[in-house]
Amino acid sequence: VQTCVLPILDGLTIPSKEAETNLHRLFNKVLEETDEEVIFNLDATASRRGGYHMFNEYGNIFLENRYTDWQNYYPYWTLRNLWMLSKYVPAEKLQIEFLNKWRNTDKYKGEVFAPENYSFEYLFATTLAGQPLAWMEGTNLPEEAFTLREHTEAYKKFQHDMHSGTILPIGDEPSGRSWTGFQSLKKDRGYLIVYRENHPEGTTEVDTWLPEGVTVRCIPLMGHGKAMTAVTGKKGRLEISLPSINDYVVYKYEIKNKR
């Protein structure tokens, strides 16, 4: 059996409690008739409608419109929105966009945080805690863009398991110059996604949701971090190293001893 994912439901307005009740009935009827093999994509960008605080039990949330044409796509803005919401909203429900960084470069001339200053892999990586959304036309992408396939294939291998954990923000708020990231918590294991933005230090200590004083084995799945075994400090602190600015690592971790 294959699950059907419906296109984005846009243009929706809920003007009254009666309308809200009727919409619930509609969604529930579709799920009942399809044996719950349908996922709705709900647009939360305008009007009075469902979003990350309501109706999110029915599928994914299309969170925001960002376009290089409008010069309102900055990778750290998108990452920051996901990071800030993830403490309160299931991150795995949020569709998070990455764009064609080769378009409209003239609109960002001289800007440190312009999309073209990041690798395409990094732009994709900023979306991993949510539902990655390639918010672009595939036409006229350069050949370089298609090397992303190896990274999307690597991601698919652990995406479901990572999304089945509780995803919370770690590190500092994304600012374009921070060490930041996410943690997916399961019982004695989970995942860490750590980003080094345009920060001068190649090594830092990141506060996590791990207990203090436990030994943690971290295996890199994506990005450019090295395998490590470390003991957590206060606030679950771990020392992380990444070789370059605007870089990242995805670790699968396991707690080896627990006090």
Language model: regions and residue ranges:
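Carbohydrate-binding surface patches
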Residues: 173-214, 248-254
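Glycan-recognition surfaces
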Residues: 18-140
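A cross-family glycoside hydrolase active-site/sugar-binding cleft signature
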Residues: 7, 41-43, 193
